[in-house]
Amino acid sequence: MNRIANYVLATAFSAGALHAASLPSTNTTTTYRRVQVDGIDIFYREAGPENAPTIVLLHGFPSSSREFDTLIPLLATKYHLIAPDYPGFGLSDAPSPAAYTYTFDHLAQTMSDFLEKLKVGHYTMYLHDYGAPIGFRIILAHPDQLHALIIQNGNIYKAGLGAKWTRIAEYWADPNAHPEVLNVFLSLEATKERHVAGTSHPARYNPDTWISEYADLSRPGQREIQGDLLYDYRTNVASYSEWQAWLREHQPPTLVAWGAHDPSFVAPGAEAFRRDLPKSEIHLLDAGHFALDEKTDEIAGLIIQFMAKHPG
């Protein structure tokens, strides 16, 4: 009897393995890769035909390239998608601040070197949250490589800074005197709020998302890493006027798809792009900071329409 049971199990496992081995891999299949960049192991997602127009997806805080999991399959039939995790985020290496200086300048340099390593020299950039200051540094260093911009709650205007930034500015003035600001910034409550604040559809939000992000923030060394980056964020605000001037001069095709209920980067930050980019497309969505949480289909549709108007 045992021999019969073993035979049945072996047959089932063999059939399953054969079926798995025969499953086709298509250009729309997301692949999960790693590459060494400046001594750092960088994790990234990739999908779509390599000869298609490339969209580089730069994630926000405290997420990773995983925030694009629902968007990538909707775009991968037409575009080549690359979504890296920054050092200190997601599945990329997180060296200590003694081994890697956590500034937005340094993250941008590492991501620029990452794109060079992958031989990606012409792209549209999708910038969310932290992706905006990282992306604009890359763009200003390599303006000839940019085809178009997709901005999703990625702020470069003082008008876009929500009320919470008043307290963060106190942290910038003296981090040691305001540890409570960093405590709140890294808390589970704040991590959840970045997703659900202002939404009228809380049941559409998967709690696994912020629980996982909070687990990442609770890893050894993360307080120091994220504290350094929060302190360095002041350099982004100081750079806003430079980035705005670049937009006015170069007028890249730009799509702004902005969650209107974001308490961090409020709606006037989206509308301000029109001042410097009169031809930009601006859409305020019934969503929050992580607009992809509930507006993936709508954002994908906007991107496909936008890219069709600006081929290349």
Segments predicted by a language model, with ranges:
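Bacterial N-terminal signal peptides that target proteins for export
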Residues: 1-8
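Hydrophobic h-region of N-terminal signal peptides that target proteins for export
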Residues: 11-21
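Flexible "cap/lid" subdomain of the alpha/beta-hydrolase fold that forms the substrate-access gate
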Residues: 22-33, 39-42, 47-54, 82, ...
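Structural cue for short, hydrophobic secondary-structure segments
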Residues: 57-60, 83
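Active-site glycine-rich loops that stabilize anionic/oxyanionic intermediates
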Residues: 60-63, 129
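Alpha/beta-hydrolase active-site loop signature
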Residues: 62, 87-90, 156, 288-291
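Serine-hydrolase catalytic-loop signature spanning alpha/beta hydrolases and amidase-signature enzymes
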Residues: 62-70, 81
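Catalytic histidine-centered segment of alpha/beta-hydrolase-like enzymes
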Residues: 288-300
